[in-house]
């Protein structure tokens, strides 16, 4: 009979097969009440599942990350229960867990309205209040098919067809409602009280726009109402920081239907863009990169040779001229290989680091576009390092160090690094993969920072390092990458003369730090809520007069600051000074300079910050020094 080993090493013996819930009850009533599921020998199971052999067991409660996922998955099933009660003709599709929430895809003859969503949420609360048990039944395949046929659930039947090897399936019963799932799920609806539906959007069956359109109901769920309230507060703050809203408020950019997914940069936004580009240009030049420029429209032949045409053609914009087919480049790498291939290269020329602020275009689905975060036309801070296999570790280590420095300059200090390793389907020998993964792992170790593996997540031709930033709202943004690639040099016949006078293929390291300028600027807007640090701010200082008598000196101050390389402007309107201060505070200008008669007399400026701090009156040269110090700090914290 089973001996159960618990996480603390203690053991409990039972003289009969025992469920996870019964083990929890034997430990204590409090734990039993909190039990959601169990992890038996590392595998998640339902609380009702029995253990009939010696095993290790971890009791899963709402405090565990796995417990939170179970709550969210069960809430998706609860959406199904409520929808089928309110709209019996609706057909249920799938309801998975996503980051911080869940959704359910549903086919219904008319669009759901906000009133429908409110009714669904209310019915879910009523069902939770019934405090009913969720019943699991492992059911033979044929019975499952008959059940869903009798209920007219066509999409469930299609999903069953996708699983021909499944002889029995888990059915979870919420009273009269039943759904099919691998589980586990909560044993009772009392665990689902801290939830909220968040939005409705469109979706397509199997994610294919050629298929029928579905409706997707999103929601979030948490272990308790305190966590839910904190999440809602964070989402409300995120809405206030939405880059689309702030972009309009600060006159940074706009998008319009005539050019979907293409950004119209206004002077203020283009100023931020230019600061980024000039900063990255200097950083890369200081680290041994040479800048290049390649065509945006390239013959189809090159994309066929590189492999992009067969794998990526549907995402490429194409055109024809004089009986030749062309593609607008979606990426820069094949073009950089063409530069490498011009002229004979020696091992002495390596590593060769080619960088480009490359304008790329990708035919993203219109439904996936989102402000400047997800666009069709974008610029990458792209570079490709051509090197020998022996140089990979040093190049990777140098890149990691550079990338972390750049992120700190932009105010990001919480950075996760991950190494994606060989997938099941891959090219190249295991020995080659061992060396490639080992070189990248050694480079990560040299950084002295924590990192983790992502097993099986590498490209089919090589491993990859990913950098993920956490912003002030705790959101993760995947930005930088370093991709090991021996494949493209082979396809495009890149070679160099090795020390033994034989031709060899270089290793190509694809790397980006910001990713796309558009997306990174969107991140910065939301991270800073538009209140950019002084070095990024479109206008670093605004000079305001109190009366017309100070207009000439105000213009003189703007001239002096401009000649010192600062972005300053004047506001000489015949408005009250309090009105001007409020307006430029809302425009998030870092420094507000007020000039009255005393300032004209003493050749000084009265300095305020956008946060409302009064820095007092000071000579213009002293303010210029203060601003220069603020700019030199970039986005770093004072303690850094």
UniProtKB/Swiss-Prot annotation:
Name the keywords, alphabetized.
Aminoacyl-tRNA synthetase, ATP-binding, Cytoplasm, Ligase, Metal-binding, Nucleotide-binding, Protein biosynthesis, RNA-binding, tRNA-binding, Zinc
SMART domains of this UniProt entry? tRNA_SAD
Residues of the region (Catalytic) are 242-533
NCBIfam families tied to this protein: thrS (TIGR00418)
According to UniProt, the name of this protein is Threonine--tRNA ligase
Output the SUPFAM superfamilies linked to this UniProt entry: Class II aaRS ABD-related (SSF52954), Class II aaRS and biotin synthetases (SSF55681), TGS-like (SSF81271), ThrRS/AlaRS common domain (SSF55186)
Oligomeric form and interacting partners: Homodimer.
Protein residues bound to Zn(2+): 333, 384, 510
Q: Where in the cell is it found?
A: Cytoplasm
Please list the reactions this protein catalyses.
tRNA(Thr) + L-threonine + ATP = L-threonyl-tRNA(Thr) + AMP + diphosphate + H(+)
User: What's one GO MF term for it?
Assistant: ATP binding
Database matches in Pfam families: HGTP_anticodon, TGS, tRNA-synt_2b, tRNA_SAD
| Task of the protein | Catalyzes the attachment of threonine to tRNA(Thr) in a two-step reaction: L-threonine is first activated by ATP to form Thr-AMP and then transferred to the acceptor end of tRNA(Thr). Also edits incorrectly charged L-seryl-tRNA(Thr).
Give the Enzyme Commission number: 6.1.1.3
From what organism does this protein derive? Pseudomonas aeruginosa (strain ATCC 15692 / DSM 22644 / CIP 104116 / JCM 14847 / LMG 12228 / 1C / PRS 101 / PAO1)
Q: Which superkingdom?
A: Bacteria
């Amino acid at each position: 009979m089973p001996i159960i080993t618990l996480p603390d090493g203690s053991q409990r013996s039972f003289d009969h097969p025992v469920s996870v819930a019964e083990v929890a009850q034997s430990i204590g009533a409090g734990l039993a009440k909190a039990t959601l599921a169990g992890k038996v020998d590392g595998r998640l199971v339902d609380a009702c599942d029995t253990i009939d052999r010696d095993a290790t067991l971890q009791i899963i409660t709402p405090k565990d990350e796995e417990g939170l996922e179970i709550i969210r998955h069960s809430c998706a099933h609860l959406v199904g229960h409520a929808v089928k009660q309110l709209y019996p003709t609706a057909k249920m599709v799938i309801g998975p867990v996503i980051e911080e929430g869940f959704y359910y895809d549903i086919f219904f003859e008319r669009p759901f309205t906000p009133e429908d969503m409110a009714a669904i949420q209310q019915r879910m609360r009523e069902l939770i209040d019934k405090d009913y048990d969720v019943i699991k039944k492992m059911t033979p395949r044929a019975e499952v098919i008959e059940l869903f046929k009798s209920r007219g659930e066509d999409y469930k039947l299609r999903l069953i067809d996708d699983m021909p090897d499944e002889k029995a399936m888990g059915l979870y019963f919420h009273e009269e409602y039943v759904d099919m799932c691998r589980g586990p799920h909560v044993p009772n609806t009392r665990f689902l009280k801290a939830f909220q539906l968040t939005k409705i959007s469109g979706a397509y069956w199997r994610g294919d726009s050629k298929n029928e359109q579905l409706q997707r109901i999103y929601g979030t769920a948490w272990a308790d109402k305190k966590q839910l309230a904190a999440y809602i507060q964070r989402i409300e703050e995120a809405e206030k920081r939405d880059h689309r809203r702030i972009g309009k408020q600060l006159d940074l950019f706009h998008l319009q239907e005539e050019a979907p997914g293409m950004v119209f940069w206004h002077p203020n936004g283009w100023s931020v863009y230019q600061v980024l580009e000039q900063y990255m240009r200097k950083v890369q030049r200081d680290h041994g990169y040479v800048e290049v420029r390649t065509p945006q429209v390239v013959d189809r032949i090159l994309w066929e040779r590189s492999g992009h045409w067969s794998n990526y053609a549907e995402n490429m914009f194409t055109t024809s001229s004089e009986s030749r087919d062309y593609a607008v480049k979606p990426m820069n790498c094949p073009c950089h290989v063409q530069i490498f291939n011009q002229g004979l290269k020696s091992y002495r020329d390596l590593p060769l680091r080619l960088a480009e602020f490359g304008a790329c275009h990708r035919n993203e689905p219109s439904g996936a576009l989102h402000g400047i975060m997800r666009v069709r036309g974008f610029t990458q801070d792209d570079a490709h390092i051509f090197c020998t296999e022996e140089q990979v570790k040093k190049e990777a280590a140098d890149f990691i160090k550079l990338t972390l420095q750049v992120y700190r300059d932009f105010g990001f200090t919480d950075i996760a690094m991950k190494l994606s390793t060989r997938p099941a389907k891959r090219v190249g020998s295991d020995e080659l993969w061992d060396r490639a993964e080992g070189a990248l792992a050694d480079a990560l170790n040299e950084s002295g920072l924590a990192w983790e593996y992502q097993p099986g997540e590498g490209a089919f031709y090589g491993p990859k390092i990913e950098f993920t930033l956490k912003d002030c709202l705790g959101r993760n943004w995947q930005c930088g990458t370093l991709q090991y690639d021996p494949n493209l040099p082979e396809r495009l016949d890149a070679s160099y003369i090795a020390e033994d006078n034989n031709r060899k293929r270089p290793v190509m390291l694809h790397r980006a730090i910001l990713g796309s300028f558009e997306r990174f600027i969107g991140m910065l807007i939301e991270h800073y809520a538009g209140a950019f640090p002084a070095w990024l701010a479109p206008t670093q200082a605004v000079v305001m007069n109190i009366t017309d008598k100070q207009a000439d000196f105000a213009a003189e101050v703007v001239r002096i600051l401009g000649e010192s390389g600062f972005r300053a402007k004047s506001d000489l309107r015949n408005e009250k000074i309090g009105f001007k201060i409020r307006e430029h505070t809302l425009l998030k200008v870092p420094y507000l300079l007020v000039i009255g008669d005393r300032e004209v007399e003493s050749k000084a400026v009265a300095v305020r910050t956008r946060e409302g701090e009064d820095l007092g009156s000071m000579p213009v040269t002293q303010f210029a020094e203060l601003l220069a110090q603020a700019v030199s700090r970039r986005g770093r914290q004072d303690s850094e």
